[in-house]
């Protein structure tokens, strides 16, 4: 009998090992595919420079030998990746026509203003301001919504409808430079600049409650939001910060997505866009809610935990949703109720009176 059990145990262990090996092969295959896609994308965008580099390496190899040719190749690869990092990080053309057609809030029954402002470097930036009806607008919070790295702000309108209805708030949607109908080209410095002008725009309006401005950032937008809230001049204008499925830094994300051991040894100056959120989050002191989808297959949920742990706010909370994916955590049951609860508690802790109009009696989580 014991011999039979021993055989069964051995077979079970063998199955586990096979399963583990299969999963490892799948992961390695996926990672190799991602790396190959990146390399092909680089060559397609820089084929002239890549061709000249190969020719130069051949000439150097003939003239000076292998070592100098190898060094030249390494420098060329670093240079190529540095100059096309914007194309690897920012995807304003996904899906197609995202720079031409931007869905508008009225398609979801929300009244809005289409606003154009100039960023501090003169770049024209497009905004949607979605306002609660009548005098209610000045008594409720206003959310500055910072979206992720692909598409345009119109692609987030269903989520914004949920915020508008369930949190009973105004919403200012920012279209980064180079996205949608905004001018310019996206860069780390440019996006952070655009967020500042959007917050300044809210501060200039006389028809909203300046004491309850919430900055919401998802994914790349979370990194922009952290930069904004980490600076005292702008933190003074922010009541609460909500971060969803964002990352600790671009170098750390590169290690996760590409998986090359070499990336662990590269100096920071190699990265054109850094978004060093983990270094900045310690300077964030406003009430901060970290919303993490545990089914996120792009940004590891541990990064949200690291940001939460290092955050400098005395009022911070990590909210985790088991079924939350990278872009769709907002569809998780209880999502809006949890956000509303955090804001209510923040209001109580600061002694702020609630809006005179009562909140909706129930939350429409299907929105």
Task: Name the predicted role of every residue range.
Residues 2, 7, 11, 68-118:
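An N-terminal hydrophobic leader/cap segment in hydrolases
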């Amino acid at each position: 009998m014991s011999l039979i059990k021993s055989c069964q145990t051995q077979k079970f262990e063998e199955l586990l090992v096979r399963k583990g090996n299969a999963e490892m092969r799948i992961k390695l295959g996926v990672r190799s595919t991602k790396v190959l896609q990146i390399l092909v994308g680089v060559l397609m965008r820089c084929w002239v420079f890549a061709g000249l580099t190969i020719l130069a390496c051949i000439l150097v190899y003939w003239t000076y030998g292998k070592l100098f040719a190898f060094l030249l190749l390494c420098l060329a690869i670093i240079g190529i990746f540095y100059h096309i990092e914007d194309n690897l990080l920012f995807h304003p053309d996904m899906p197609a026509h995202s720079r031409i057609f931007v869905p508008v809030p009225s398609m979801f029954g929300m009244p809005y203003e289409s606003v154009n402002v100039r960023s501090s470097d003169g770049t024209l930036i497009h905004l949607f301001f979605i306002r609660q009806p009548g005098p209610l607008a000045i008594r409720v919070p206003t959310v500055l919504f910072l979206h992720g790295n692909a598409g345009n702000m119109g692609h987030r309108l269903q989520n914004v409808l949920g915020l508008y209805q369930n949190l009973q708030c105004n919403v200012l949607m920012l279209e980064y430079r180079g996205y949608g109908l905004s001018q310019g080209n996206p860069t780390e410095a440019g996006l952070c600049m655009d967020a500042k002008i959007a917050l300044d725009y809210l501060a200039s309006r006389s028809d909203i409650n300046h004491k309850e401005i919430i900055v919401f950032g998802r994914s790349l937008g979370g990194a922009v939001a952290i930069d904004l809230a980490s600076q005292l001049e702008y933190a003074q204008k922010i009541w609460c910060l909500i971060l969803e499925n964002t990352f600790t830094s671009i170098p750390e994300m590169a290690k996760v997505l590409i998986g090359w051991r070499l990336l662990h040894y590269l100096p920071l100056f190699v990265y054109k866009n850094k978004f060093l959120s983990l270094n900045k989050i310690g300077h964030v002191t406003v009430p901060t809610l970290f919303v993490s989808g545990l089914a996120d297959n792009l940004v590891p949920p541990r990064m949200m935990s690291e940001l939460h742990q290092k955050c400098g706010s005395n009022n911070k909370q990590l909210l985790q949703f088991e079924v939350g994916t990278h872009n769709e955590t907002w569809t998780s049951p209880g999502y809006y109720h949890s956000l509303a609860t955090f804001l209510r508690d923040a209001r109580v802790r600061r002694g702020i009176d609630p809006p005179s109009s009562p909140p909706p009696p129930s939350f429409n989580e299907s929105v």
